[in-house]
Amino acid sequence: MAPKLDIILHPPENGEFYSSDDLISGTIVLDLTKSLSIKQIKVGLKGFTETTTKMDSEYVFPQNGMLGPATENKSYHNLVREERRVFPPDNVWDALEGSSKPFKVKPGHYEYMFQFNKLPSKPMCLKNHTKKTICFVSKSQSTMPPSFNTQWRELNKIDNLDLYFYSFGKIIYVVEVEIEMGRPRTWFKPFDKMLREPKIIEFIPEPKKFASNETVTRSGRNNHGVIDYISKNNSSKSLSAMQESEDGVTAIAPNGPDEKFLARNLDQLDINNDLEYEIEETEENPMKRYKCRYPLGLPDGASMMWVEVRSRDIDTIYRQDFLFRQGSGNFDNVYLIVKGNLSFSDFSNISVKPTRLQLNLLETVSYLSQGIGNENFSSLKLMEIDNLSKSDRPLFDTNELKFISSKNHEIMECEIKLKDNPILKRLQFNEEDYKHRGNRLYSFKTCVITRLFSYQLLIDWNINGQTRQTETIIPVQVFAHKRPPPVNEALPRYVEPPSYDDHV
């Protein structure tokens, strides 16, 4: 009967996944039913990134008048590699002085403890990057990435093309035990037999903000002390790469068609800005204002309206954060903006009612290999409410419209009180710890894989009997951790001051 080998890992501190502060440790269990010759037993911690990209047929150039099949490009990056020997002990191993003679281990039950250091903050593949290496991030911005697509075998099925292309990238961390047998070598068995037992672990580093993927430009001052973000695309379609050059880091940020699978040569793609914003330089913490790229025209033919989301912290979300509750810093300040030469009475004569609300989370996963990038798009519905016009509490009141100073046109605003809706105020982000295609919800960037998210706020409007829709896209950094509690510095303990007498 073959020896039975198992790895029992100590659970992580949070009980769900290993993080940056965890020491990965455990026990190797070996059961032998008969004597076995063993040279050594080692346990290793390995991490690697693997990507496969393909070229679309329209970008494949024919050779000799013949159109060949699309080529594959593969990339492999080592992230971490540690090794511990648990048998024989160090003093015995040192005494052998290089002898290859095995140990004859008697039948029985054996346990060996092991422990690795904390995972480093930087991947080990960075030392192999040259100035011409094309990556999504520069060396200074690169951090140890989280596990991704650990169940890639279940996705790698040709009957579902979305999942098939999604499985082309993976980040795997594995603890593997290796037993080197000590059987004598012969001419027909020149190598020692190895017995291996791997166990994949899930690693997600501690929350840490990284540089935003959006390219922004400063365009003057705003009268209200806010940053204006305008989405230029109907879906998140940016594929940005970083190439180390002699003069510094060159950003390559192409935009492609709205496809679920895209392959291009990064050198042939144009640079395009996804967002524009304005900032009031005098404010220390300006509020950001995200608005629709395409406003809705009103029946008078000269006026328009759009939806704005104002927040300081909406670009970061933790698990179980409230999305609409007042004070959440997410969708608790949403406004309807009307621009034109309308007065209060003119706008009141127009029937404007919200009828439906939907909030989606857009996912963009990009893979890179040998200068060829592929993108995968998907959408997750976070919530949906119909029949808003029949609600007991209207979302906005036209009597609360107020004018905002403007040079050329009159601008009015009215708050859309999503925070007062009894259903929305209880909604928390990712309360059930949802796994999308086997992966928890989190954003990250690494050398050859990026996973980015954006909110998509859709509101259907009934304007004088016609149904129109506004769309607001907001890029967001998603963390799989719960928000850490605020650190409140405790006041020093009160000490009675010394007393002094008047006489000497």
UniProtKB/Swiss-Prot annotation:
The primary location reported for this protein is cytoplasm
Pfam families the record matches:
Arrestin_N
Q: Does the keyword Metal-binding apply?
A: no
Location(s) in or outside the cell? Cytoplasm
UniProt keywords, alphabetically: Cytoplasm, Endocytosis
Q: Report which residue ranges the record marks as coiled coil.
A: none
Q: In Gene Ontology terms, what is a biological process of this protein?
A: ubiquitin-dependent endocytosis
> What does UniProt give as GO cellular component?
cytosol
User: Can you name one GO molecular function term for this protein?
Assistant: protein-macromolecule adaptor activity
Source species, domain of life: Eukaryota
Q: Which family does it belong to?
A: Belongs to the ART10 family.
Instruction: State the function annotated in the UniProt record.
Output: May regulate endocytosis by recruiting RSP5 ubiquitin ligase activity to specific plasma membrane proteins in response to extracellular stimuli.
Q: Which PANTHER family match?
A: ARRESTIN DOMAIN CONTAINING PROTEIN (PTHR11188), ARRESTIN-RELATED TRAFFICKING ADAPTER 10-RELATED (PTHR11188:SF174)
Q: What is this protein called?
A: Arrestin-related trafficking adapter 10
Organism of derivation? Candida glabrata (strain ATCC 2001 / BCRC 20586 / JCM 3761 / NBRC 0622 / NRRL Y-65 / CBS 138) (Yeast)
